[in-house]
Amino acid sequence: MARNSKATDTPKTVVEKQSRKRKQDVEDAEESSSDEELQVEGILDDAASEDEESDSEDADKEDDEEEELEGDSDEEFNELLGEEEDLSDVDSEEFSDEPRDETASITDKLSGTKIRSYSNATEDEENEVHTKFSDGRPRIIKPEINPIYDSDDSDNENFNTIGNIPLSAYEEMPHIGYDINGKRIMRPAKGSALDQLLESIDLPEGWTGLFDQNTGTSLKITDDELELIRKIQAQESTDENINPYEPTIEWFTSKTEVMPLTAVPEPKRRFVPSKHEAKKVMKIVRAIREGRIVPPNKVKEQQEEEKYNFDLWNDNESETKDHIMNLRAPKLPPPTNEESYNPPEEYLMDEEEKKKWLEMEPEDRDKNYIPQKYNSLRKVPGYQEGLRERFERCLDLYLAPRTRHNKLNIDPDSLIPELPSPKDLRPFPIRCSTIFQGHTEKIRTLSISPDGLWLATGSDDGSVRIWEILTGRQVYKTVLVADDNTDDNIESLEWNPDSNSGILAAIAGEHIYLIVPPIFGFDIENNGRLRIESGWGYDTFGNKSKTKNSNIKVNSDDEDEEVEKADTNTGKKDVCKWFTPNTEQSQAGISAIIQCRKTVKKISWHRKGDYFVTVSPDSGHSSVLIHQLSKHLSQSPFKKSKGIIMDAKFHPFKPQLFVASQRYIRIYDLAQQVLVKKLMPGARWLSNIDIHPRGDNLLASSYDKRVLWHDLDLSSTPYKTLRYHDKAVRSIKFHKANLPLFASASDDGSIHVFHGTVYDDLMTNPLLVPLKKLTGHKIINSLGVLDLVWHPKEAWLFSAGADGTARLWTT
């Protein structure tokens, strides 16, 4: 009994002591605070614990009481907390008496004081920035407010103050949280299923059907909140003070203007009926008269008449028409003579054909049956393949795609251009009349003298031979490459265009040999030697410094080609050197030797015979070199060059230079020192170019089996692209006389001769007619015809092949 009485008396004593302690703490705090501010470190309980240490007697008594309370069992304390009715009575009794007033008085007293944490105050003061305004007054810039921790965007007061603790922690407890005073918020009683049904039927005011977990009750919305939601949904202003229908101020129409803005009299068309409207009205009237437009009242009459007027025997009205994109399945082909029950004898198979047909796979057979012969139709047995054929037919209809092919009603003859007959375009070479034999290796190059009497050939055996055209006899031979030198070959050679000089330029590896063969008369040979030797005197007496810089200055194009601005002396020393021949070479007719940096592949003379251009694809910026015979000068016109240079030629009569790289052809003006045009043939790898004698057309050959005709007056793309060779095209040449002929040589061993007429009228396109395909050279190691050259006067064609022979093709 004593134990029970002690347990019952404990809550009262605890409440009284706590109230007395709090009152004493507040009084001490009021006395100590001079500026009506109380700085509290932590919470009020911690401050109370510090005051308890000052009162030793009260502390001893409270320790004894706490020991007595600790002696009580946990079960009794839980029972004390679990008794809701007793606690409610105790709370009501205790807080209704004077102690309740005392606790309330503490909050009243604390309401007028400013409580702030000392640590927070020091942090705020440290983060403050003290500056001055422009007038000198002190200015304090306070730190920014953290929107996550220093503010709250919620307008409603939080009823349940459990913080971030999940509500699932209170599922097994009778309460759902604590209010701001620390009291428990008891879980509201749940009604039965019948009560919930009645609530769903009779909806209370502000019912939303939502459940508020913080309070444990249904969420209700007030009329003001509903009105706010309605305004937001209707996109109306939520502020009642804003009037959306305020009277507007008519700035322009408020004052009536007496005078008109424009006093122009009204035109007559405003009062006359419109002609365009009259046309539209007449168009509608004609449509009504013709019956294309039916008035609404007559439409109903026609529909009623059509109900009773129909074709009784017409069964196709219910069938719908196919869609415009519908493709019907093709019909089965009709049976042939082989499928007859009594076919002719020639349609029947013999024993070998039957055996071969049976051994073949079903997919490889041209027909899936063996023709049979019966004397009469009544002897024909049942067809065993009917089911299989129907199944295959279904597979074809189901799996085979169908496409619609529009038939072109075009006359095939209209697609073929109207070309003249080759018989009307004679003369042109049609047969091989002479074969020049003597070289042991393939002949890479050949050239014919300007007078048309001598043919020069260069071969991989290292020799240069000169032949008499009329007889086919060899008249001159010189060896430029030794037998032990396997790296160098005779790459190219060409006669000087001046027939009075008799100079032959031959290329062997890195050297250029200027030869005057002893086959001409004394005058021509002496003239050629003097022309070459005059350059030595120019070099000896040092007249180079007196001449102007003859470097070709070409503006850089899109591939960053620049002009080399070095002087002539440095240019000659850098790019190549001129040497005099030794005694043996002089006796062989060699008058000068030019040594370059890399292997030279192509050579071409200027029409006057004083300049010639060479191409070294591996020499980089000095790939193109221009040499002057009369001064023994060599210069590189370009400082930089992207791509590999394949060929270079002078214009027939203009001061222009054509340079062909792997993919592009550039035309440079040597007088104005600019890039004139850039041609884009569209080929992967160009091999050779040639210019028409009139200078307005160009031919290019490529290793990807193309022959490209460029009209220089038109665009930069080819006018015609000819693809008639089976392998790489090695050479392409125009006839230099007045004959409109050109030919191309390929590795397929064939030579194609074409007729190409260029008209004076710029509006007329060139006429290209294929004339003849010449074959005769053998293909050795996938190489066929390597070079071509036309006779300067006749319609004769010379060709050099990989079989070690040169051929003359005549009419």
From Swiss-Prot:
SMART domains noted in UniProt? BOP1NT (SM01035), WD40 (SM00320)
Subcellular localization: Nucleus, Nucleolus; Nucleus, Nucleoplasm
An annotated GO BP: maturation of 5.8S rRNA from tricistronic rRNA transcript (SSU-rRNA, 5.8S rRNA, LSU-rRNA)
Q: Which GO terms describe its cellular component?
A: nucleoplasm; PeBoW complex; preribosome, large subunit precursor
List where Basic and acidic residues composition bias occurs. Answer: 128-138
Which residue ranges have biased composition labelled Acidic residues?
Answer: 27-96
User: Which coarse location class applies to the principal site listed for this UniProt protein?
Assistant: nucleus
Name the source's superkingdom.
Eukaryota
Residues covered by region (Required for interaction with NOP7) = 270-386
Spell out the InterPro entries in the cross-references: BOP1/Erb1, BOP1_N_dom, WD40/YVTN_repeat-like_dom_sf, WD40_repeat_CS, WD40_repeat_dom_sf, WD40_rpt
Question: Region Required for interaction with YTM1: which residues?
Answer: 386-422
Molecular functions per Gene Ontology: large ribosomal subunit rRNA binding; ribonucleoprotein complex binding
Q: Where along the chain is composition biased (Polar residues)?
A: 1-11, 104-121
One Pfam family recorded for the sequence? BOP1NT
The answer, when asked if Nucleus is one of the entry's keywords, is yes
Q: Which UniProt keywords apply?
A: Nucleus, Repeat, Ribosome biogenesis, rRNA processing, WD repeat
WD repeat residue intervals: 438-477, 485-525, 595-637, 640-678, 681-720, 724-764, 780-811
Q: Where is this region: Disordered?
A: 1-138, 547-566
Q: What does this protein do?
A: Component of the NOP7 complex, which is required for maturation of the 25S and 5.8S ribosomal RNAs and formation of the 60S ribosome.
Subunit organization? Component of the NOP7 complex, composed of ERB1, NOP7 and YTM1. The complex is held together by ERB1, which interacts with NOP7 via its N-terminal domain and with YTM1 via a high-affinity interaction between the seven-bladed beta-propeller domains of the 2 proteins. The NOP7 complex associates with the 66S pre-ribosome.
Q: Which HAMAP family match?
A: BOP1
Q: Which family does it belong to?
A: Belongs to the WD repeat BOP1/ERB1 family.
PANTHER family given for it? RIBOSOME BIOGENESIS PROTEIN BOP1, RIBOSOME BIOGENESIS PROTEIN BOP1 BLOCK OF PROLIFERATION 1 PROTEIN
- Can you say what this protein is called? Ribosome biogenesis protein ERB1
Q: Name the gene for this chain.
A: ERB1
